[in-house]
Amino acid sequence: MSKNADLEAIPAAEEIKKPNPPKEEASIKGFTWWRRTLQYNTGLGLSEDEKLNYENDYKYILERKQCKQCYEYKDWILKYSPTVTFMIQQIAKLSDGNPNIDGKNLKPFDESKIICDICPEWKSGGFHPDLGILICQNRIRNKWHLEDTLAHELVHQFDNLKWKVNWLNLKQHACSEIRASSLSGECRFGQEFARRGFGFKIANGHQECVKRRAILSVMGNPNCKDRAEAELVVNEVWDSCFNDTRPFEEIYR
């Protein structure tokens, strides 16, 4: 499984407990919710049970809002992103039941295999060959972050269909991570500058970003002993995998 890492060093996974639905829907709407918020913020007449119920309901509202926003972003990106729509077309050509290589009369891409959910890990998305693509709704910063994340995971899906990747094989995993970070757009100048500011190197900055993110992802592989092994494996496959831009003719973003 792919882990789309965003940080220099990956923090430990959070312990996330999903909130329970509110006892009454009316309690999180209108005047009642405003009153509860005011009471929580001031502490006036607030019992411990009321405090815990408010915190649960606040988290419930936040997660529901994140989920709605994530699916809205996803639907927009699937419709309007040139990178994502191109990847979907290429994946459709490789999918079972789609032997028509000229791209005509293809079965539609199964968008239900792209889901939004809460992720305890500090990653923005993931790919599983049997389950599909996960978008981490609590880690997505904006629509364009979701576009990069989805493009990254679609490269993994393409690789898995074309080459039957063994995700526990470190070299195969590393190769797909290199390609996904390079082709998705997540290492383009604007994104790296936003993340790293003036620490971003204009010369070879794209390559350094791709290598850094690939190493972090390979470190999450259960067969990887440590960072040193991840770096070794990424370096071993670097030249061939970085220069392989399929299904694009070149690095598009």
Swiss-Prot record:
The lineage of its organism: Eukaryota, Fungi, Dikarya, Ascomycota, Saccharomycotina. It is a peripheral membrane protein. A divalent metal cation binds at residues 152, 156. It comes from Vanderwaltozyma polyspora (strain ATCC 22028 / DSM 70294 / BCRC 21397 / CBS 2163 / NBRC 10782 / NRRL Y-8283 / UCD 57-17) (Kluyveromyces polysporus). GO terms for biological process: mitochondrial protein processing; mitochondrial proton-transporting ATP synthase complex assembly. GO terms for molecular function: metal ion binding; metalloendopeptidase activity. GO terms for cellular component: mitochondrial inner membrane. This is Mitochondrial inner membrane protease ATP23. Residues 1-23 are annotated as: Disordered. The active site is at 153. Pfam families: Peptidase_M76.
